[in-house]
């Protein structure tokens, strides 16, 4: 009986995690044609400015998103901030999936630091 409760709990946990999974660059790149643009947005809380190497434990408003103009609301790559090593991994993933970095620009709000990375799809 105790084993059944453990199995049910594990199954519910696994289903919950799968249901709330985030998207990969590869998944978000599907259906994007050569020559189209996409934007990676790195959004940090102002206090994350000094936590760029190690990230932080709480998620807050920090996130990394990939906008392709499809408007399907599946643009979240990661919620929270795991440090700039993770940003580099995502930028390398963009390159591996046929994207070329065109430009970057910062946006500074009262409580957020936002950096946009503009990419062009160069490979199908």
Task: Describe each PLM feature range.
Residues 2-8, 19-124:
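Terminus-proximal functional modules
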Residues 13-14:
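Repetitive helical segments and hydrophobic/amphipathic motifs
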């Amino acid at each position: 009986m105790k084993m059944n409760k453990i199995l049910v709990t594990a199954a519910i946990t696994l289903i919950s995690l799968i249901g709330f999974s985030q998207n990969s660059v590869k998944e978000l790149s599907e259906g994007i044609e050569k020559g189209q643009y996409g934007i990676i947005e790195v959004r940090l809380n102002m206090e994350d400015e000094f936590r760029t190497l190690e990230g932080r434990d709480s998620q807050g408003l920090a996130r990394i998103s990939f906008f392709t103009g499809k408007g399907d609301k599946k643009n979240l790559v990661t919620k929270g901030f795991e440090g700039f090593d993770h940003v580099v991994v995502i930028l390398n993933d963009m390159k591996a999936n046929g994207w070329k970095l065109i430009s970057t620009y910062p946006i500074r709000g009262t409580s957020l630091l936002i950096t946009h990375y503009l990419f062009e799809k160069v490979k199908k």
